[in-house]
Amino acid sequence: MTERLADLAIREVVELHDFFCAWLRPHNGSQLDPGRFERAFDPEFRLVGPDGGVRDRAAIVGWLHDLREGRGDNFRMEVSDFRAVWQQGDAILLEYVETQYLQGKTTQRQSTALLKQAAETPVGTSPLGIIWVHLQETWLQTV
């Protein structure tokens, strides 16, 4: 039996964020394959960050390369509170909360991600057969 699209999409979000934690920590990122995130993003991928800035796929991939091992040893990221908002065919819109812990500070973002099933991308086989098409993040107040 194959996994439902919602389950696969949630798994992709969790696994990619776990990868980012390892990628951004000192002494971890150099051992990891950047293809994990490069193959995860659709060629037309766009991120609307919590500050309202818009970045395309090339900008995000470049930024992630620049940040490799750039966070402290205590950097952590968690994703939670998943909700499938919409699904049609091979596409799904997910909401989730991303929490980051860095240098004693906690920040949270409400994220809405459009993902779709796609085995192949221009840069190779996508992890889990799911690719990111669009991501919108909004700051949440932390207490």
Outline where the language-model segments fall.
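A beta-strand edge to alpha-helix "cap/lid" segment located at domain peripheries
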Residues: 1-25, 29-31, 46-143
